Amino acid sequence: MLTFDDFDAWGEAVRGADLRLACDGVETPQWRLAFRNVGAVVLQLGYEGGGNLCFGGNNHQGTLLWMPLGEPGHQVANCERCDHGSVLVIPPGADFCIQVRKRAHAWCSIALPGTIPAGDRGAASHVLHADPLNVRRLTSLITRAVSAPEVDLASPSVAEGLSQRLLAVASACLAQDVEPETTLGRPKIERMEVVRRIVTALDADPMGGRSIADLATEAGVTNRTLGRVFSDAFGVSPRRYVQLRRLHTVRRALRGGDPHDDTVARVLARHGIWELGRFAGSYRRQFGESPSDTLYRRG
């Protein structure tokens, strides 16, 4: 299992998804990640030392199933609060959002082969509410397969047998979808489209000086609706989400900088930031270190 003391470095190691991540509070400054290919399926197990506001897209050829581990209720996927039977189903090419506010948490995922009919390319992601017993069987099997080095997958027969067990349990989860008990806010397709438009705009110009009114206009909604959508999707206001994205953009630049040639002031200036003291205070509150600490530690 890979261990990281930096959230962004951990995020860059996550496989099979194009992610925009923002750390939301740290309980324990440690993030861990493990992967395992089992025949035609790809397993992933993640432990995060704090909260995470995530928007991403599935890069696998087949459907990706994401499931929270531990006690439910703290994880929100596609604006729906997760329970013991929640499975986030992400077809190939589909995007999704996940929020966990200000707490350490864990999750696992399984990428199915493209031949498994679990979601067509271009279809939207959605939260499936399956039998909790089947979901527990699947998460336990994934956790054991990834965490147990004694499982020898070099043997084709062992790998094939485990792959078939994983696919059988995953198929059992997909076969039953019960009505969700908790739905936050407005219809999820509309909300996801609003989130998608804002994230796309921020991807194009993460350090731009757009106002919240500008972003609402870009998404085709009112300021009030934009606020409700971001509260449902990420648990924060649009302004706070934009601030977090800006902080992480600068952090990545500092991590990739050369302390022999760069200074914090130059990096910030390249990102249109001139109020160095104010920004440094926000940066320290978010990451627990100063911008110069990041530049010199990563250099």
Q: Can you say where each PLM-predicted feature lies in the sequence?
A:
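N-terminal low-complexity or simple alpha-helical regulatory segments
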Residues: 1-61
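Short, conserved beta-strand element in jelly-roll/cupin
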Residues: 57-73
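Short hydrophobic/aromatic patch on the recognition helix
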Residues: 226, 230, 278-279, 283
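Alpha-helical DNA-recognition elements
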Residues: 232-233, 285-286, 297
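Alpha-helical structural segments
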Residues: 244-249
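Alpha-helical bundle regulatory/interaction domains
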Residues: 1-26, 64, 73-206, 211-213, ...
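Short, basic-rich loop-to-helix N-cap that marks the start of a DNA-contacting helix
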Residues: 240
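Short acidic (Asp/Glu) patches
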Residues: 47-52, 69-71, 91-94
